[in-house]
């Protein structure tokens, strides 16, 4: 019985570890999304190019493909600073 008890407790530790990994992944993706909204809103009252530079630096620090894709998609809004370029499309 002690062998079975120790095996089941090992299984519990593995499941706890997996759930912790999943929660950290979901936290990571939500912070990526918030960085994305900052990135895409570079032309929304932030001073155009100068406002977008801060978003670009933040995107480089995060270093994800999603951020890079949003930078490439939103370069026009960052450069022009148009008032109707708020958020990601």
UniProtKB/Swiss-Prot annotation:
Highest taxon above the source species: Eukaryota
Family: Belongs to the hssA/B family.
Listed name of the protein: HssA/B-like protein 22
Annotated organism of origin: Dictyostelium discoideum (Social amoeba)
Gene that specifies this protein: hssl22
């Amino acid at each position: 019985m002690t062998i079975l008890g120790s095996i089941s407790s090992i299984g519990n530790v593995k499941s706890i570890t997996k759930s912790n990994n999943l929660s950290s992944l979901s936290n990571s993706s939500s912070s990526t999304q918030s960085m994305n909204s900052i990135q895409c809103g570079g032309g929304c009252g932030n001073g155009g190019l100068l406002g977008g530079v801060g978003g670009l630096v933040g995107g480089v620090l995060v270093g994800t493909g999603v951020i890079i894709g949003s930078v490439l998609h939103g370069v026009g809004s960052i450069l022009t600073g148009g008032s109707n370029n708020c958020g990601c499309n």
